[in-house]
Amino acid sequence: MPAYWVARAKVNDPVEYKKYADRVPAILAKYGAKVLTRGGRYQTLEGQEKFNRFVVIEFPTFEQGVACFYSQEYREAAAFRRRNKAGENELVMIEAGESQPAQAR
């Protein structure tokens, strides 16, 4: 069953963030991922407008998406982004389908 990375980012330094973003497609390809949207037009409809870049990436399975995130290559790319203060990201892994809402943690 497909699964998705859903990322929200606040880009602080576009030049440095691009260096990070340019590294990611080759990493994703190793996990069979497909970029569905990456930085296109958006409008905040609810909530605070903290983020200015949105990305949705499809993986063949939930496990492949998690493995990609924890791969050495992606960890190095993310560390570069954080070290250079290029941007702040929030990333969730979501499996396709519908289920009951989770209880509060």
Regions from the language model: what does each represent?
Residues M1-F54, F59-Y70, Y74, I94-R105:
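Short S/T/G/P-rich N-terminal loop/turn motif that feeds into the first structured element of a domain
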Residues V66, R75-M93:
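C-terminal structural segments of small proteins and small subunits
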